[in-house]
From Swiss-Prot:
Cell wall formation. GO terms for cellular component: cytosol. It comes from Clostridium botulinum (strain Eklund 17B / Type B). SUPFAM superfamilies: FAD-binding/transporter-associated domain-like, Uridine diphospho-N-Acetylenolpyruvylglucosamine reductase, MurB, C-terminal domain. Pathway: Cell wall biogenesis; peptidoglycan biosynthesis. PROSITE patterns: FAD_PCMH. Residues 33-198 form the FAD-binding PCMH-type domain. Its EC number is 1.3.1.98. Gene3D superfamilies: 3.30.465.10, UDP-N-acetylenolpyruvoylglucosamine reductase, C-terminal domain (3.90.78.10), Uridine Diphospho-n-acetylenolpyruvylglucosamine Reductase, domain 2 (3.30.43.10). This is UDP-N-acetylenolpyruvoylglucosamine reductase. It is found in: Cytoplasm. The gene is murB.
């Protein structure tokens, strides 16, 4: 009996066959459209399933990775050994007055749309971010002068010892692309956001403005993980990369976007190695020319 058969048996009481996919191509589950297979991909749709899955993995010493929308992840070409828990089906959104509670697999654009529907302001910045709620809280995602820390009230998380706890905004320790969740290896279950009442036409106008700006300035026509690098203090990664003469620079099937140099794109059937090699090349050139270290914002996972 091979390891994958063991996985199927192990999770068969918890999942329907349609929720288990063996040797799933990760290139079909991340926005970069690269990456080798995972032994088994599970798609839970309840909190109980998520908790029990993680407990089974820990009890059996099976490596696991929790994936939201796959928008800020790069999976290596050799794939992932163990289990990927994809939360795309765990995506309920419930509004109560000025608060919205969303499960971690819910898309930010859907939360933004729910806020707009109720004339709630504060989440316009997230209307075009392609990520999920869990991933956004994990890294304190932001865009256009807004970020998760401005609107979050609390998050329900699973701690490393398997307990479900609720963390207040302060306890989340949200900073630039970081959080207590990231530092302590917690898993986001739900997040609750608190908004101000606003004027629907103004909110709609801002959403439309940001959508147009994103379409004009970002290479949305190519697979990517958004901004590849974190913003270095006192600089902008995209400008450093452009000033280093790397606009449109290509390595294999990966390229620096000519539209926005902060984006690496999968231009022509790139491999994960193409993208990783390009990341490394950019880091070396920017360091050599400007003495500035660039650190990836995209999460890199998988086997070498």
């Amino acid at each position: 009996m091979n390891q994958n058969k063991n996985y199927r048996v192990l999770f068969s009481n918890l999942y329907k066959d349609t929720q288990m996919q063996e040797n799933a191509k990760m290139s079909e589950h991340i926005n970069f459209r690269v990456g080798g297979p995972v032994d088994i991909l599970l798609t839970p749709n309840t909190k109980e399933q998520i908790v029990e899955t993680i407990n089974i993995c820990k009890e059996n010493k099976i490596p696991f990775y929790v994936l939201g929308n796959g928008s800020n992840v790069l999976v290596k070409d050799s794939g992932i050994r163990g289990v990927v828990i994809k939360l795309s089906e765990f995506d309920n959104i419930v509004r109560d007055g000025n608060t919205i509670k969303a499960e971690s697999g819910a898309l930010l654009k859907d939360v933004s749309a729910e806020a707009l529907k109720a004339s709630l302001t504060g989440f316009e910045f997230a209307c075009g971010i392609p990520g999920s709620v869990g991933g956004a809280v994990f890294m304190n995602a932001g865009a256009y002068d807004g970020e998760i820390s401005f609107v979050i009230k609390e998050a329900e998380v699973m701690s490393e010892d398997g307990k479900i706890i609720t963390l207040s905004k302060d306890q989340l320790e949200l900073g630039y692309r970081t959080s207590a969740i990231m530092k302590k290896n917690y898993i986001v279950i739900t997040a609750t956001f608190c908004f101000e009442s606003g004027e629907k036409d103004k909110i709609e106008g801002r959403v439309s403005e940001l959508t147009n700006k994103r379409e004009e300035k970002q290479p949305l026509e190519f697979p990517s993980a958004g901004s590849t690098f974190k913003r270095p203090e006192g600089h902008f990664a995209g400008k450093l990369i452009q000033d280093a003469g790397l606009k449109d620079f290509t390595l294999g099937g990966a390229a620096v976007s000519g539209k926005h140099c902060g984006f690496i794109i999968n231009k022509s059937n790139a491999t994960a190695k193409d993208i990783l090699d390009l990341i490394e090349y950019i880091q070396k050139e920017v360091k050599k020319q400007f003495g500035v270290d660039l650190y990836p914002e995209v999460r890199i996972i998988g086997e070498d």
